[in-house]
């Protein structure tokens, strides 16, 4: 099972952040199935940090104490992406980009929790959960997600 992450929307930067649950922002080590991972400072993420997490499709910034870069998610079970998510998420993101009223922070966090983290945390399907970068992430080429076979059980 992957380290538990908290989904938070940062309205000041207008990005969705995943923060390790219980970890302090100053880089407290995280205990996970792969041993102890230290959270780097928000200012710099070493190029090799988290490279072993590439099998999960997570970019190396995923375990930063500042949270990863803006992300979009694809769940093999829900087939939810920013393109086909019932037209809800694309419209919300577009409105937020334009500075228009959109889905509340609470509703957006609940959306990601319901669509993504339920499968990941409760059903243990982290292998079939793919995380793709929306844009502007300098780490996206370090851990490119592997192709997903939707018919292979986790």
Swiss-Prot record:
Top-level taxon of origin: Viruses
The signal peptide stretch is none
Question: Describe its PTM?
Answer: A fraction may be phosphorylated in insect cells and HepG2 cells, a human hepatoblastoma cell line. Phosphorylated in vitro by host protein kinase C or mitogen-activated protein kinase. N-acetylated in insect cells.
Region entry Mitochondrial targeting sequence, spans:
68-117
Q: Name one GO cellular component term.
A: host cell mitochondrion
Keywords of the record: Activation of host NF-kappa-B by virus, Activator, Apoptosis, Host cytoplasm, Host G2/M cell cycle arrest by virus, Host mitochondrion, Host nucleus, Host-virus interaction, Modulation of host cell cycle by virus, Transcription, Transcription regulation
Q: Which GO terms describe its biological process?
A: DNA-templated transcription; symbiont-mediated activation of host NF-kappaB cascade; symbiont-mediated arrest of host cell cycle during G2/M transition; viral genome replication
Q: Where in the cell is it found?
A: Host cytoplasm; Host nucleus; Host mitochondrion
Q: Which HAMAP family match?
A: HBV_X
Assembly and oligomerization: May form homodimer. May interact with host CEBPA, CFLAR, CREB1, DDB1, E4F1, HBXIP, HSPD1/HSP60, NFKBIA, POLR2E and SMAD4. Interacts with host SMC5-SMC6 complex and induces its degradation. Interacts with host TRPC4AP; leading to prevent ubiquitination of TRPC4AP. Interacts with host PLSCR1; this interaction promotes ubiquitination and degradation of HBx and impairs HBx-mediated cell proliferation.
**What does the UniProt function comment say about this protein?**
Multifunctional protein that plays a role in silencing host antiviral defenses and promoting viral transcription. Does not seem to be essential for HBV infection. May be directly involved in development of cirrhosis and liver cancer (hepatocellular carcinoma). Most of cytosolic activities involve modulation of cytosolic calcium. The effect on apoptosis is controversial depending on the cell types in which the studies have been conducted. May induce apoptosis by localizing in mitochondria and causing loss of mitochondrial membrane potential.
Give the similarity note. Answer: Belongs to the orthohepadnavirus protein X family.
Q: What is this protein called?
A: Protein X
């Amino acid at each position: 099972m992957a380290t538990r992450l908290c989904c938070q929307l940062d309205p000041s930067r207008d990005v969705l952040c995943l923060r390790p649950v219980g970890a302090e922002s100053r880089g407290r080590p995280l205990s996970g199935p792969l041993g102890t991972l230290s959270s780097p400072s928000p200012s710099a993420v070493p190029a090799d940090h988290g490279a072993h997490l590439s099998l999960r499709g997570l970019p190396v910034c995923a375990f930063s104490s500042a949270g990863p870069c803006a992300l979009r998610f694809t769940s093999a079970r829900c087939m939810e992406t920013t393109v086909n998510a019932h037209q809800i998420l694309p419209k919300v993101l577009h409105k937020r980009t334009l500075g228009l009223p959109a889905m509340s922070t609470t509703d957006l966090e609940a959306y990601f929790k319901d669509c993504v983290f339920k499968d990941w945390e409760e059903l243990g399907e982290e292998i079939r959960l793919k995380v793709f970068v929306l844009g502007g992430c300098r780490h996206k080429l370090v851990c490119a997600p592997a192709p997903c076979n939707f018919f292979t059980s986790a």
